[in-house]
């Protein structure tokens, strides 16, 4: 099973300019909370690159201080942190927010959904951004594309999986609607942030997990 094109979203508070950012002599500093361990290749470094690009595009007038998971808020609470003004920006994945609205899942990895190119085309040219804006408006937020991992791999397991019968009762780390799909096969979905996955596998708290793919997984110790 493959999941398609995880779009990492930069969530921006629509009232961010009024959320008490640090201001000095016409310069502003915003806070960006993320769901990723500090310096994590791909996802974490992507957030840092986004922050650097924003500073460059603003001519240095706006700087972004990037917070890794847990530094300012827990990894899976970026959405709420931006909504309540703790931070002006967040960098994470939409399927972490399905507790706020099931529609959030459609703006990140979705089982048997868009390819990377299809997702980008839908957001930019197929009214996807309009729907995203409408979905986040009640929370005072706006979502934007901020990168893509491409097609993702299925998982890592503590024991060999030979058939569907081996999935029965398997505690498997996966967020979003992919967890619902696997639940139909007898899997028990568990939501965990990236930094907690490997320790949970080591301890036996979970039986399997998915993250992204070879490049990103290697950084978390999956190989």
Where are the regions a protein language model picked out?
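N-terminal secretory/targeting leader peptides
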Residues: 2-119, 127-223
């Amino acid at each position: 099973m493959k999941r398609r094109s995880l779009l990492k979203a930069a969530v921006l508070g629509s009232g961010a300019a009024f959320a008490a950012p640090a201001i000095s002599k016409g310069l502003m500093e915003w806070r960006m909370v993320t769901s990723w361990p500090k310096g994590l290749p791909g996802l974490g470094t992507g957030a840092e690159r986004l922050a650097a690009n924003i500073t460059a595009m603003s001519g240095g007038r706006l700087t972004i201080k990037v917070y890794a998971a847990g530094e300012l808020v827990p990894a899976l609470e970026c959405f709420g942190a931006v909504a309540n003004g703790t931070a002006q920006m967040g960098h994470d994945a939409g399927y972490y927010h399905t507790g706020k609205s099931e529609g959030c899942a459609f703006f990140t990895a979705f089982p048997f959904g868009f390819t990377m190119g299809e997702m980008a085309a839908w957001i930019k040219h197929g009214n996807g951004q309009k729907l995203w804006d409408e979905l986040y408006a009640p929370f005072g937020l706006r979502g934007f594309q901020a990168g893509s991992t491409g097609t993702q791999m299925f998982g890592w397991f503590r024991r060999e999986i030979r058939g569907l019968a081996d999935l029965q009762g398997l505690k498997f780390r996966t967020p979003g609607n992919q967890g619902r799909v696997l639940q139909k096969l007898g899997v028990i979905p568990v939501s965990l942030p990236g930094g907690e996955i490997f320790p949970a596998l080591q301890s036996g708290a979970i039986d399997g997990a998915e993250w992204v793919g070879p490049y990103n997984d290697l950084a978390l110790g999956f190989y």
